[in-house]
Every structure is written in structure tokens, then in C-alpha cells.
Amino acid sequence: MSTYENYSEASKHYDKTRVPVGGEILIGVLALSRKSRSEFRLLDAGCGTGAYAALVLPYVDHIDAMDINPGMLAVAREKLADATSGANIAFHEGSVASMPFEAACFDAVMFNHVLNHLESGQDGNFYGHRTALAEAHRVLRSGGLVVVNCIGHEQLRHGYWYLHLIPTALSACHDRFIPAEKLEAMLSELGFALEGRFVPLDGLFQGAAYFDAEGPLRPEWRKGDSNWALAPEQEISSAEAKIRELRTSGDLGPYLAEHDAKRRQVGQATFFVARKI
């Protein structure tokens, strides 16, 4: 479903430089919501390699993990093999735009950095977002939760020290990520009531690897952030040349620190939580 990344290839390296940012927010939301449910069934829509599913599995009764890419799904199955034996989790190959589930069968649906992959970024209408969220509304029980974990425009500009090195990709990403106000309006139009917007200020997508100033020189490091897939080869080469120049001059560490300074105020991701009316 992704319009810009080959996840069959990326799945081989994804978990080397990627962690589930904001897990504590997700766990808290699900734990509070399940208090009113004797059994709690969660859909991980666009589960990728299963990082978020692994994190929240102890807090729900059952997870259905779905992804359109067989490579990502294979990694998730391997990662969660022990849980599968206890029937806590089931895996499905399918699209978030047409979910292979009956209506009103889930207590929560989570989209973790998925919806931007449904857009070309050219018309500004975000039909991919709307289609997926409408499907979430369909498969949720009354009062069920949808959690959208995505990147805001200010976070794109200031939350990643290296993105300014690939301006074409940064611009393309900006057009694919829905503005917060538009997302909240869309949720309301689709029959959801917004319950909150949360930003994990200390979360890092790449964990400790984020501070590897020479990371952009390595393809496997870049595979942990699909934004690099939107950069033309010439732009990647230019970014690599800049990193090497700074390394040679001894200025690479200060350069990273300078361009990372605002991340502590804006974070790298935003969680939107809404309830089906």
C-alpha cells in the first residue's frame, strides 16, 4: 500500500534502527479503555514488523495484526511466535483501505505511522486517511477507540536532525502527513469523538541509533526511516558528502546537536485518540 517505500526490502533491516515511540501512551490508553470490557480485542492496522503489537500484547486479550506487505508480516510472525502459540494474536495480510473483518468486532484499532503511506500528497484531500479511518469506524464496536500515531508538520521540520539534508523528501513528506486540525475534523465527520492529542517528547524512533551522526552514510540505517525513500539519489549523495565533510572537519557532533535542539520541544510523533460515537 505504501506509495514510496519497498517494505519487502526494508523489512530486512527495519528493526535495527526502529523502536515503538510513545508506547507508554498507547499502553495507558488501552489499559484505561479495557476496564469497561470483559474481553478486549485490538486491531493493529498496518502492523509492520509487530513492534507495537509486541509492546501492547500483555494489556489486551487478543490482537489481530494486519499488514499488506508479506515481508513485514513475516518478521512480525517470527517476532511474536511465542504469543501465537497461545492464540493471543493472529496475523492477516490485508489492506487498511478494505479491512478483511466483519463490522463491530474490535474494541480498538491502532494506526502506527501508516496513514501517510496511503497518500500521493498531490491533492491535499487525504482520501487515503479518510478511507482507512472509515474502515476503522466500521470494524469498531460502539464506544471503541481509534488511535492514530503520526508525525506532525512541526515535528518533521524540527524533530529529526537529518531531514533538512534531503529537502525534496522533506517536502514530499510534508504533503503526505495530514495537518492535526484536518485530522481532528475528519475524525469528527466520520463519527468519532476526539478524546485527546498526546506527544511523547522523549521518544526516539531510532532509539540510540538516532544519535549516530554517521548513520545517514549507511543504507541499513536509512531503511529505518522511510522518508529517505523519497529522496532522489543525487540528494542522498549530497547528504552523504555533507556528513563526510563534517566528519573530516570534526564538526559532525556539534552539527547534529544544533539541528536536534528543537526536538526536545516538539517531539517526533503525535498520538490522536478518538472514540466511536
Model-derived features: where do they sit?
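A short acidic, Gly/Pro-enriched loop at the edge of an enzyme's catalytic core
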Residues: 97-109
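Short alpha-helix
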Residues: 175-191
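C-terminal helical/coil "lid" or tail adjacent to the Rossmann-like core of SAM-dependent
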Residues: 203-256
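A short SAM/SAH-binding and catalytic strip from SAM-dependent methyltransferases
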Residues: 108-127
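A short glycine-rich, Lys/Arg-flanked "PGG" loop and its adjoining helix->strand segment in the class I
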Residues: 127-142
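Conserved class I S-adenosyl-L-methionine
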Residues: 1-40, 51, 72-75, 82-84, 145-174
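Class I SAM-dependent methyltransferase SAM/SAH-binding core
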Residues: 43, 49-98, 131
